[in-house]
Amino acid sequence: ERFVAVDTEFRRRDTFYPQVALLQLCWRKESYLIDPTKISDLNSVAELLADSRVIKLIHSPSEDLEVFDRWLQMTPAPLFDTQRALAILGRGFGLGYRAMVEMYTGDVISKEETTSDWLKRPLTDRQLSYAALDVTYLRQIGEELYDKCEETQRLAWVLEDTARLTFGGRGPAAKFKSAWKMKPR
């Protein structure tokens, strides 16, 4: 299988670092919801996310990458960012996930679950449905965008631009989004 769609749910309201609440994968056309509070051995997940033969489809991944770095001490690769692909294909700069889904499927996703408490257990049926659909849409649209980028000879641009997110320093300053704005002491 050449693609896996990847997303995370986390909370960051009252912490400096995000608290991972759920990992969502769409792999081999099936959606998997992985509860980090219930599973301690994540080696097989980390192996899949590190497998260079599998393209990780992801939308606007900066916060997700921070989650993976803190939680699994790794960065998934190779990555294909659907938000960057949309921009490079001229279909919208900085387009959000909901807008992308509506553009490609006509479906309108509720915003309600995005702000729900993902750390509270048990997760509700609505949360579980939302989380599974999240990566199902991402997989479908991501594959379509990947193929379109390949067809228009822009795939290398997206992959290169997305790969830049995974490089750089690993220290605290590199992880702090606006560190470059701070005045030195």
Regions found by a protein language model. Give the residues of each.
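DEDD superfamily 3′-5′ metal-dependent exonuclease/proofreading module
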Residues: 1-185
